[in-house]
């Protein structure tokens, strides 16, 4: 029980994005990523509008529950922000206990429909230890209208590179499945050094360099993403609390998973050289944004409710029966 309370100075510094060619974030989690992220829809749209970013992708873990509110707020005349509707899914092949993160973005209304199908199928048929997983064959079946990204360190590509130590030609085969590849700030993967998977920060840079080489060899785009879970740098203490509550022993070592401005992101990838950094931070994410329509996750005209044979008569009979029991 709290015996006293006092207002604390949150210390939040209002950041601005003054870059004349702003970036697009393609990997971001809202509070709908259960017990994992802290960004609210209102906070996100307000920030994206203020920073002048052309669009933002929302990719919550295994769910699309943020979509209705995202559509409502982003399409308001006072905001008019483009949202790229997506999800971070759990991809698996034949091993029941092994799945990989994958970013799935809806390119158009067909993609929205197929994304919904994947959400339904993964929750109804392939839940394993709380994770709604998507078989690769099912994803391929419903791939129309979707853009697939290789995701984070928990994705198939980085896991195969860092933990399985697969040779380069095998990595090329894996990378060829995806429409674009993803690299992230070094802080996101700092635990790989802490746990001995790579020797030092230079090893983390080499992971990103290898992904870039793969994209060059395969003719694919590589994009730099934040994998944002909270809005500002100082917010990571709150995610530490969430992770501690979930039992993570390394919760105190929180990576800086905050949403970065364009210049902040360019600084993160300065080791690639100015031209290459601009390519992955600004040019390529904007190219992917240009491929994507302004989608409506909730239809404007009507909703398509399920048709269950005999349901109207059954409901009527149930109501009359209950009424007779009560009265």
List the predicted regions and their residue ranges.
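Residues in well-ordered beta-strands of folded domains
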Residues: 84, 90, 103-106, 149-150, ...
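Metal-dependent DNA phosphodiester-chemistry modules and their immediately adjacent helices/loops
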Residues: 94-95, 105-132, 250-267
């Amino acid at each position: 029980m709290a015996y006293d309370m006092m207002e604390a100075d949150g210390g939040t510094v209002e950041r601005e994005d003054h870059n004349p060619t702003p970036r697009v974030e393609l990997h971001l989690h809202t509070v709908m990523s259960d017990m994992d992220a802290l960004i609210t829809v209102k906070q996100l749209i307000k920030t994206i509008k203020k920073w002048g970013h052309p669009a933002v992708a929302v990719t919550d873990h295994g769910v699309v529950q943020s979509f209705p509110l995202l559509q409502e707020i982003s399409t308001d005349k006072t905001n008019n922000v483009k949202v790229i509707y997506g999800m971070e899914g759990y991809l698996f092949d034949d091993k029941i206990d092994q799945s990989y993160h994958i970013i799935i973005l809806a390119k158009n209304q067909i993609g929205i429909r197929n994304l919904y199908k994947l959400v339904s199928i993964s929750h109804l048929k392939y839940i394993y230890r709380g994770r709604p997983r998507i078989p690769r064959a099912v994803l391929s079946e419903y791939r129309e209208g979707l853009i697939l990204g290789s995701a984070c360190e928990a994705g198939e590509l980085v896991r195969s590179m860092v933990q399985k130590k697969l040779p380069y030609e095998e990595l090329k085969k894996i990378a060829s499945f995806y429409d674009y590849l993803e690299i992230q700030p070094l802080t996101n993967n700092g635990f790989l050094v802490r746990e001995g998977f790579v020797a030092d920060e230079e090893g983390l840079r080499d992971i990103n360099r290898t992904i870039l080489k793969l994209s060059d060899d395969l003719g694919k785009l590589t994009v730099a993403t934040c994998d944002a879970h909270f809005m500002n740098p100082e917010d990571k203490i709150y995610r530490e609390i969430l992770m501690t509550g979930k039992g993570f022993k390394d919760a105190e070592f929180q990576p800086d998973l905050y949403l970065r401005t364009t210049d902040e992101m360019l600084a993160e990838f300065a080791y690639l050289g100015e031209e290459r950094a601009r390519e992955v931070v600004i040019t390529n994410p904007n190219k992917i944004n240009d491929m994507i329509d302004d989608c409506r996750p909730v239809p404007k005209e009507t909703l398509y409710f399920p048709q269950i044979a005999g349901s109207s008569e059954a409901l009527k009979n149930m109501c009359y029966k209950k009424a007779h029991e009560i009265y």
